[in-house]
Amino acid sequence: MAQTTPTPHVALIFGGNGWIGNKVFNILNANPDVTVYKAKSRADDADSVAKELDCYGNVTHVMSFIGRTHGTYEGEKITTIDYLEKPGKLVENMRDNLFAPLLLASVCKERNIHFTYLGTGCIFDYDDEHKYGDVTTGFTEQDLPNFFGSSYSTVKGYTDRLMHLLNNDTTLNVRIRMPITDEIIDRNFITKITNYKKICSIPNSMTVLNELLPVLMNIALDKKTGTINLTNPGVISHNEILEMYKDIVDPSFTWANFTIEEQNLILASKRSNNCLDTTILEYDSNYKVKNIKESVRDVLTLMKGNIYP
């Protein structure tokens, strides 16, 4: 039996060893008002989850940073959602991107524990009502998914809808997009696009983790519920990021563009492109969040320091 703790918040993180989950663990671990644990039970095993919650006894927050977006198939490392288009990957997709998060949400609802689910905003695509690159017509938290061009987005879209329907009173459903940090790793969106041979440049909402993860933790610890679009205000295109990268990080960097039609020919699945409305994040939550272009510039300055210390 784990010892009780006097801290006001006790958090149990599923996916705490993953890229984003570990970042969240470190943020919470540095907060003297929080005791944080990395879950050892499997998120798709209800009995194990219940036993682990019973073990700690005083958990106030459960957070899910699990999910399936990449993997290795027949010896090939696939760093994109095209992994989920491979034969036999439907089970992993449904288990990790639908069943496990909903199981955690259900268990938390039964115990009146606040649950934070890291979902995605890659469930929308520009259309006649949500115009290409137009920040005034962004998808709101209440909009229903309209993009089903990949197995990943299809499953995650229905997970998003179920979080609305079943668990809105205890669950914080968080939508992020194209996560960005200053790290030189293949999970970082900037690193990804600097390594691509060709780029399809489209204005999109994106999430700068350096800035928004601490904001998310404040929202979660305040036990806010419902859905929130956790992206920096505004949109930025791939070319704009790469132009900044060339200006700030590597003056010798070059790239080539191709069309979305040409991109679709080489990918196993289509990609979501959209602008998410950030009114709730900016105004209802009272957090001062930088515009995406300003925040990306800040991250690139840090990235330069990581490459050329």
Placement of each model-derived feature along the sequence:
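Mid/C-terminal beta-alpha module of Rossmann-like enzyme folds, strongest
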Residues: 215-268, 272, 298-300, 307-309
